């Protein structure tokens, strides 16, 4: 989304080219939501759309290429992290227990046909800040290299992602509870114990 639509509300219609390099990712989500809405509006099927934002926590697979399992696996294997671009891209992170509570609230009490953002809008942190937090947890320096985006990586990667969860707060009394630092610490400790380092 453009900067004026971040934090992003459920009502935001998107800013994606249907033939752009990210289309396979974004359009597949859009198709899923469209099908749910069609069944709701035409067939009376009770549906909701849940839009999760960067859910993380223990139990993620080491082969998952999202930032936390990817970084931790490389660190365990003593392999420098690869930071695409400047490292100033920002994201928010929602711990798994907070996400699951949000999902359940939507399933049980969501207004049929409505979409709900599930995430934790605070804090919005950069990739470099995340690395510093991991360093503090591990008690050691983490090596990393800033590299260009590979050709296989979709272009137009958003510089910021942050949900507006005011609708969920108002309608479903949803409040993320787990501080991101605590969540990252528990997650990294779990990864250290169970990851084999595949890199």
Model-predicted segments: where are they?
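Residue-level signal for the nucleotide or nucleotide-sugar donor/cofactor binding architecture
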Residues: 23-26, 63-66, 88-97, 125, ...
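Non-catalytic, hydrophobic alpha-helical segments
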Residues: 99, 103, 118, 130, ...
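Catalytic helix-loop patch of NAD(P)-dependent Rossmann-fold dehydrogenases
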Residues: 2-49, 54, 61-64
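C-terminal "lid/loop" region of Rossmann-like NAD(P)-dependent oxidoreductases
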Residues: 86, 113-116, 128-131, 139-160
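A short C-terminal helix-loop "cap" of Rossmann-like NAD(P)-dependent dehydrogenase/epimerase domains
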Residues: 10-16, 44, 71-83, 137-149, ...
């Amino acid at each position: 989304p453009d900067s004026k639509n971040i934090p992003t509300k459920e009502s935001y219609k998107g800013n994606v080219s249907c033939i752009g390099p990210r289309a396979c990712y974004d359009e597949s989500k859009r198709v899923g939501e469209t099908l749910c809405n069609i069944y709701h509006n035409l067939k009376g099927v009770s549906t909701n759309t849940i839009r999760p934002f960067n859910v993380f926590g223990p139990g993620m697979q080491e082969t998952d290429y999202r930032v936390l399992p990817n970084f931790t696996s490389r660190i365990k294997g003593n392999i420098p992290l690869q930071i695409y671009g400047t490292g100033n891209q920002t994201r928010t992170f929602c711990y798994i227990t907070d996400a699951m509570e949000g999902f359940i609230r939507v399933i049980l009490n969501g207004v049929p046909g409505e979409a709900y953002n599930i995430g934790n809008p605070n804090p919005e942190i950069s990739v470099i800040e995340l690395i510093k937090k991991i360093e503090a947890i591990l008690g050691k320096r983490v090596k990393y290299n800033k590299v260009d985006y590979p050709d296989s990586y979709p272009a137009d990667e958003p510089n910021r992602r942050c949900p507006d969860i005011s609708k969920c707060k108002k309608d479903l009394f949803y409040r993320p509870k787990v501080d991101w630092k605590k969540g990252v610490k528990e997650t990294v400790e779990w990864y250290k114990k169970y990851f084999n380092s595949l890199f």
